[in-house]
């Protein structure tokens, strides 16, 4: 099975207008990614406010994204839930709609054991024929995969990757030493992309690339061509942007940045709130200093 989980994957925001999906803005957002040749887009992940979507909205978001992309780049859907039955329904619907793969985190809030985490993903693996990326986000889910559970899950034939949002930079080395050769490890933290890939990572699921996919793509291309100096120069330039985009809970800052650049409304669903005035100012200043335009 082809492994689509590599390179630059943009964790897309979900645009809303009047508390409904804004499909016109979605088209602008997705086409911006296609234009700059990202390697894939992730729909309905944490950055996409997936927990706020109804099942019907989830289906519409995926269906519309598939139509817009029209097979130009892979689409990865988010299928995270603390309810295994519901997560299976998301995975089954993703398969039916025609996405290229999906990502899921361990069930949040309920704090399953490692055996429970394994059984959850085994159930997702059984319900579809799509490639799967594990999503390690312990600050969000409250639990994480142990290295041993990652190894066990990697032996299931369609579990092909791990997106790691942790800060343990030894982890990719440890995992790489035990898993099958075609199992990919990617970072979900913009600010550590180079350090993570130096330790065995092969890609990056990025929030910043919602607004600077061209720069993020250039950074990764330089890194992959062993132009370490060039990659570091770009990374250094982007560090203030990474900081600004996490000055408040993701996706609050990136939603405002996208709005400021004309991609979508600055509408975010409760319990998240709009960016504070100080956060807005910080975001505006860095966008201006980097001359970011859409």
Curated annotation (Swiss-Prot):
Protein task: Catalyzes the condensation of (S)-aspartate-beta-semialdehyde [(S)-ASA] and pyruvate to 4-hydroxy-tetrahydrodipicolinate (HTPA).
HAMAP family in UniProt: DapA (MF_00418)
Underlying gene: dapA
Subunit structure as annotated in this protein's UniProt entry: Homotetramer; dimer of dimers.
Cellular component terms per the entry's GO annotation: cytoplasm
Chain residues that bind pyruvate: 47, 205
Single Gene Ontology MF annotation: 4-hydroxy-tetrahydrodipicolinate synthase activity
Cellular location(s): Cytoplasm
Pathway this chain belongs to: Amino-acid biosynthesis; L-lysine biosynthesis via DAP pathway; (S)-tetrahydrodipicolinate from L-aspartate: step 3/4
Its EC number(s): 4.3.3.7
Site annotation Part of a proton relay during catalysis: residues: 46, 109
Reaction(s) this enzyme catalyzes, per UniProt: L-aspartate 4-semialdehyde + pyruvate = (2S,4S)-4-hydroxy-2,3,4,5-tetrahydrodipicolinate + H2O + H(+)
Domain of life: Bacteria
Database matches in Gene3D superfamilies: Aldolase class I (3.20.20.70)
Gene Ontology biological process terms, A to Z: diaminopimelate biosynthetic process; glyoxylate catabolic process; lysine biosynthetic process via diaminopimelate
CDD domains membership: DHDPS
Active site: 135, 163
UniProt source species: Rickettsia africae (strain ESF-5)
Protein's name in the database: 4-hydroxy-tetrahydrodipicolinate synthase
InterPro entries reported for this sequence: Aldolase_TIM, DapA, DapA-like, Schiff_base-form_aldolases_AS, Schiff_base-form_aldolases_CS
Record bears the keyword Cytoplasm: yes
Family: Belongs to the DapA family.
NCBIfam families: dapA
